[in-house]
C-alpha cells in the first residue's frame, strides 16, 4: 500500500516537474524572440507565444491544485547515493525556504507600483471628468452660439421701425452683442435649467 502511495507521489511530482520544464523552455524561447532584433517582433508571433505560455501556466496551476494534498504531506530528501558534495549548490537551492533577494525586491517593487497606480486612479478620474465637463460646456456654448446665429430673425431695425422712422444705434447693438457673448455660459445654464424643469 505504501509503495502505491509513493508511486503516485512520484508521478505527481514528475508531472509537475514536466510542466515547469515546459514553462522554462517556453520562456527561454519567448525571450529569444523578443531579443533577437532591435525592432519589436510581429504582433501575431508575440501573441502566439504568449498564449502558449499562458496555457502552460494554467496547466501547471491545475496540476498544483490537483496534487495540493500530496505536496503538503510529502517530504523529499536526497537518497544515500546522492552526490552531496558535487551537487551542493543545487541542494542548497532546492532546500531554500526563503525567496531570493532579487525576487523579494521584484515583489516589493511590484506591490509599490500597484499601490501607486491604485492611489492615483481616483485623481486621474477626477481630472478626466473635470476636463470632459469643460469640453462639454465649450461644445455646448459653441453650438448654442451657432444656433442663435442661425435663428436670429432681426436686423438693425424692424420693418415697422423703418416705416415709422425709428432707428437703432449700431453701436448699441454691438455693445449688446458683446454683453450677450460674455454671459453666454449663464444663458446656457438658464436654458438647460428651463429645459429640465420648465421654470425660468
Curated annotation (Swiss-Prot):
<dbReference type="GO" id="GO:0016592">
    <property type="term" value="C:mediator complex"/>
</dbReference>
<dbReference type="InterPro" id="IPR019364">
    <property type="entry name" value="Mediatior_Med8_fun/met"/>
</dbReference>
<comment type="similarity">
    <text>Belongs to the Mediator complex subunit 8 family.</text>
</comment>
<dbReference type="GO" id="GO:0005634">
    <property type="term" value="C:nucleus"/>
</dbReference>
<dbReference type="GO" id="GO:0070847">
    <property type="term" value="C:core mediator complex"/>
</dbReference>
<dbReference type="GO" id="GO:0003713">
    <property type="term" value="F:transcription coactivator activity"/>
</dbReference>
<dbReference type="GO" id="GO:0006367">
    <property type="term" value="P:transcription initiation at RNA polymerase II promoter"/>
</dbReference>
<comment type="subunit">
    <text>Component of the Mediator complex.</text>
</comment>
<keyword id="KW-0539">Nucleus</keyword>
<dbReference type="GO" id="GO:0000978">
    <property type="term" value="F:RNA polymerase II cis-regulatory region sequence-specific DNA binding"/>
</dbReference>
<keyword id="KW-0804">Transcription</keyword>
<keyword id="KW-0805">Transcription regulation</keyword>
<dbReference type="Pfam" id="PF10232">
    <property type="entry name" value="Med8"/>
</dbReference>
<keyword id="KW-0010">Activator</keyword>
<comment type="function">
    <text>Component of the Mediator complex, a coactivator involved in the regulated transcription of nearly all RNA polymerase II-dependent genes. Mediator functions as a bridge to convey information from gene-specific regulatory proteins to the basal RNA polymerase II transcription machinery. Mediator is recruited to promoters by direct interactions with regulatory proteins and serves as a scaffold for the assembly of a functional preinitiation complex with RNA polymerase II and the general transcription factors.</text>
</comment>
<dbReference type="GO" id="GO:0003712">
    <property type="term" value="F:transcription coregulator activity"/>
</dbReference>
<protein>
    <recommendedName>
        <fullName>Mediator of RNA polymerase II transcription subunit 8</fullName>
    </recommendedName>
</protein>
<dbReference type="GO" id="GO:0060261">
    <property type="term" value="P:positive regulation of transcription initiation by RNA polymerase II"/>
</dbReference>
<dbReference type="GO" id="GO:0006357">
    <property type="term" value="P:regulation of transcription by RNA polymerase II"/>
</dbReference>
Amino acid at each position: 500500500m505504501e509503495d502505491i502511495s509513493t508511486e503516485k507521489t512520484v508521478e505527481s511530482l514528475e508531472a509537475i516537474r514536466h510542466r515547469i520544464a515546459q514553462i522554462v523552455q517556453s520562456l527561454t524561447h519567448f525571450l529569444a524572440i523578443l531579443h533577437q532584433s532591435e525592432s519589436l517582433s510581429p504582433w501575431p508571433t508575440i501573441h502566439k507565444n504568449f498564449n502558449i505560455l499562458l496555457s502552460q501556466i494554467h496547466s501547471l496551476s491545475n496540476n498544483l491544485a490537483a496534487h495540493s494534498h500530496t505536496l503538503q504531506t510529502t517530504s523529499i530528501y536526497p537518497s544515500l547515493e546522492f552526490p552531496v558534495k558535487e551537487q551542493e549548490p543545487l541542494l542548497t537551492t532546492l532546500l531554500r525556504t526563503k525567496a531570493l533577494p532579487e525576487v523579494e525586491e521584484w515583489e516589493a517593487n511590484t506591490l509599490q507600483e500597484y499601490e501607486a497606480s491604485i492611489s492615483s486612479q481616483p485623481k486621474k478620474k477626477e481630472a478626466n471628468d473635470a476636463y470632459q465637463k469643460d469640453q462639454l460646456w465649450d461644445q455646448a456654448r459653441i453650438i448654442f452660439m451657432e444656433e442663435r446665429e442661425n435663428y436670429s430673425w432681426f436686423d438693425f431695425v424692424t420693418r415697422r421701425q423703418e416705416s415709422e422712422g425709428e432707428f437703432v444705434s449700431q453701436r448699441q447693438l454691438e455693445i449688446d452683442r458683446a454683453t450677450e457673448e460674455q454671459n453666454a455660459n449663464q444663458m446656457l445654464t438658464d436654458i438647460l435649467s428651463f429645459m429640465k424643469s420648465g421654470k425660468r
